[in-house]
From Swiss-Prot:
The keyword Cell membrane applies. It is a peripheral membrane protein. Coiled coil: none annotated. Keywords: ATP synthesis, ATP-binding, Cell inner membrane, Cell membrane, CF(1), Hydrogen ion transport, Ion transport, Membrane, Nucleotide-binding, Translocase, Transport. Gene3D superfamilies: 2.40.30.20, ATP synthase alpha/beta chain, C-terminal domain, P-loop containing nucleotide triphosphate hydrolases. The record marks S373 as: Required for activity. Belongs to the ATPase alpha/beta chains family. This is ATP synthase subunit alpha. Its EC number is 7.1.2.2. Produces ATP from ADP in the presence of a proton gradient across the membrane. The alpha chain is a regulatory subunit.
Amino acid sequence: MQLNPSEISELIRAKIQNLPSATEARTTGTVISVTDGVIRIHGLKDAMQGEMLEFPGGTYGLALNLERDSVGAVVLGEYEHISEGDEVKCTGRILEVPVGPELVGRVVNALGQPIDGKGPIQAKASSPVEKVAPGVIARKSVDQPLQTGLKGIDAMIPIGRGQRELIIGDRQTGKTAVALDAIINQKGSGVICIYVAIGQKASSIANVVRKLEEHGAMDHTIIVAASASETAALQYIAPYSGCAMGEYFRDTGRDSLIVYDDLSKQAVAYRQISLLLRRPPGREAYPGDVFYLHSRLLERAARVNAEYVEKLTNGEVKGQTGSLTALPIIETQAGDVSAFVPTNVISITDGQIFLETDLFNAGIRPAVNAGISVSRVGGAAQTNVIKKLGGGIRLALAQYRELAAFAQFASDLDEATRKQLSHGEIVTELMKQKQFSTLKVSEMAMTLYGVTKGYYEGIPVKTALKFESDFLSNIKANHAELLADIEKSGKLSDENDKKLAQAYESFKAGYNFA
């Protein structure tokens, strides 16, 4: 069979016309070096800051340093298979994580992938991990309480929905315990909780999951885990991923609470990445933008107004405000709150709960130091009954600590000082609370009423907690309607005041303190 030249040209023309025309212009680069998960790439002229880069084997990275002739990136995951000379592609996308109610009750990694063995998550929406915080006009003042269920915190350092309250203290002072109690106490309140574990042991994270499951709190909780065995990049990204998940609920007119446990480890991971990227080190070898690292994260926690929610939901949700409350945790070294990262986060947040080693070791748990703990905006959000009854608690504790220091050297004390010391001892004892035994507002009000009205005067300090527990049981059995009324209204009416006074008097008169 012979073909003449005209037939050959016809065949070639037909082939060219039928070729698929879907071409894709992609910028590619070459890996120059791999150092502990930080990769330097030659080329990629069009790469954007924070853009996802595609490595061989379906691995992705994040472009962080854009230099004249190279790009510095971190790998999100395993990097052992990446070697010098590998081809890298730009994706034109920024890092996104799945968000929505489908994640509730699940344990995910920093990229939103499930790690609890319960199958894939069919999330209908996704969100960028880095987002601009709501502006001034979109925000609403904090005026709704977020109850932690802990007497010492709800009475002295109240937290409002949309607030950022720092939990700070040395290791082993009960920081995580306070945060977990706050999560457990949101059961039935409609608040969705996100617990972000950064740089912790995998066994510790498993223990947290088990405790939350035992207390029925996983039904309203998402856990984002970036354990100590994960790369520095994933530990750096985890808080932003968790925040994006919490923002979904805030922006759809719901309330959410996020715990970052802890941001000290995130700062260390970011320092590691920055030093490997050869960014100039500053104080304590942290990079110059470590303040911005935390400020851009914590500014995303806010209470937003109904107009903002309506706009973001395209009119589906009307007349509802949303909030994201943040409880960042910072670990100090030997109680040094003047170190670089602690001072940064203190200045960003709306107050701090300072937990002290000495108090913890003395059996005062939660080990809250009332003197330097503060809530800058929570007072406006405090429940009326707690505000009314708990006003003197903080002052009593602060005065007691001051007097107790002087009383050690004084042999003869006047009556007023002795009275103040005994009152302070009782208050200190009553602020103790076991872990996972959170109280409702009405139950808390019973104790605060007794302290404020002097019904605990003359009671032996050792029996104060037993008296409190027995009185609560008595009230639940005989005056359940009183508790229900206070719980519903959040106020103590004159009628209920009289009933409560009578209940205390009759119970105390017949109580055996032996």
